[in-house]
């Protein structure tokens, strides 16, 4: 991971929006990927950081809250007990653990309706049964090792 991305991660962990903006925007503009690799964000409140185009690889986001934006990418990361209540997000996740996630009727992982809807996709991820049912109601795509289900 680059020194710039490390400083961005440190600013997010410190909940320091001015430092985040100072580090990010000269180097990484809106719509460009911000890639975090092997970073710890456990317990972090992302409320003031729009996370669109954030990429988390091999990261720990356990017990984080207010993860929102589109798209957000997770690969081989622990995202356990994350608080998604009131959040709107489009997530692409592969090989992650989302067990224990919190959500409510305001939580939205699909934008729009029908074939043109933007849908979150969870590939080979660990999910609680209740979360899978919640995703089914919304139309989230869940892809497992042995089958492809559009729920």
Show which residues each predicted segment covers.
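Tandem repeat scaffolds
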Residues: 6-9, 14-151
